[in-house]
Amino acid sequence: MAFLRSRLEPVVFCAQVASSFFDTGLQMIVKQRYENNTHTAAGGHNEQKSIAYFYMIFNILTKVVAIIPAFLLARIGDKGYRKVPVVVPLIGYFISRGLLLFVIAFDWTIEVMYASPIVNGLCGGFSSYWPGVIALVSLSTSEEDRSLRIMCIELTYGLAGFLGSLASGHLFQLYALEHRQGVVLACASVVLYFMCLGYAACIFQVNTRRPPVELDERRESDRVGILSSIKSNVALLFGAGILYDMAVAGGVEILNVYVLVEPLSWTATQVGYGNAAGSVIFITSFIGVKLFTRCSLSDTTMILIGMFSFLTGIYFMTFVTTTATYYIARALTLFALIPMPIIRSLLSKQIRGSSYGRTFTGLQLSFQLAGLATSPIFTKVYQSTLQTLPGFVFTLSSIITLLAMIPISIVGCRTARQEGYERL
């Protein structure tokens, strides 16, 4: 019991299973509603555009509303109340995810779901929740173990997503209330979020590991001489993270729409399996980090390998027309989840522990702000190329990934040069 009280894995696991249930449920309800309300005489293109437009608005609200609350919660967390940036967003998840249950049970219009990201965002949303988790993990581990520890949290997140996605398609069809599917799935999501909230608020205890005083003093004296170098590295890491997140978020957002209509036209079960395939990447990325660490590869090299893996997979997705080729493209992205945890780990090694919350939240909010442009741009590009090459948007994603590799390469060269000077 004492071991569990100091671990965040139960919260991360249950919350991600609940999120997988919600995502699959929302995907299928949106598809069903627009199938009933949209004329599909033009080969399903009107339905496709309507679904893409819904998700564009939904994702923009998710990104915008959380900006100020997340920053305020990060400041509170850095003042010593480390659980607040995790607990408050879980309250928002619990309330906002319950809306899907009401939409299904009472046959409300699907536009009611726009209130979900608003309620969730006012409680900080993922922009507060995930940086809060990473800050707690970083504070409780040494620098040597931090990259692997953060990757373990990512692995837990991925395993939960894998299992949740596998089950979600079946749960969606398990019970129909007056011919309306998804009631069991929505209920399960709400119950799991309630369990997460109870664990985080009442059971979990913050365990902060303070570095030795002499180590802190040595780090401070080192920074006096290389302050400008550290600032440059932080800026480059932020730039690379933002570009890579734009590529991944934009590509995956459209991919969620792409699989629902022709040429794939997936069912609820296939959507669940597809999401599960995406979650397997967390496992392969974790194995990759373990393997590359044993081979003594640098952090920047591991990031570049992960980015190249995503680049090849998402480019191949441009030409996907069957379920089999979809899974081949997914297989190529087996290391795509390596970059973000390693970037966060590198950032944590550049700053003081008292700034973790603000730094990680600042990074997450940078993703949100960049996403304000990413979501409509990718959606408009997708809609405008539907008649010619529907997968062109994935080529755009691969180009942005290539750009993200440039600042990481610069950081790698600077770090190698600095280590060479230290040896001399």
Question: For each of these PLM feature ranges, what is it?
Answer:
Residues 13, 96, 107-128, 242, ...:
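Hydrophobic core of transmembrane alpha-helices in multi-pass small-molecule transporters
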Residues 116-156:
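Cytoplasmic helix-loop-helix junction between adjacent transmembrane helices
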Residues 59, 145-172, 193, 364-376:
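Glycine-rich segments within core transmembrane alpha-helices of 12-TM secondary carriers
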Residues 91-108, 308-321:
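C-terminal ends and interior cores of transmembrane alpha-helices
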Residues 173-191, 380-401:
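A membrane-interface helix-boundary motif in multi-pass transporters
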Residues 14, 192-205, 373, 395-424:
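Multi-pass alpha-helical transporter architecture, strongest
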Residues 66-68, 271-295, 306, 310:
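Transmembrane alpha-helices of Major Facilitator/SLC transporters
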Residues 1-3, 207-243, 261-262, 266, ...:
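Juxtamembrane intracellular "pre-TM" segments in multi-pass secondary transporters
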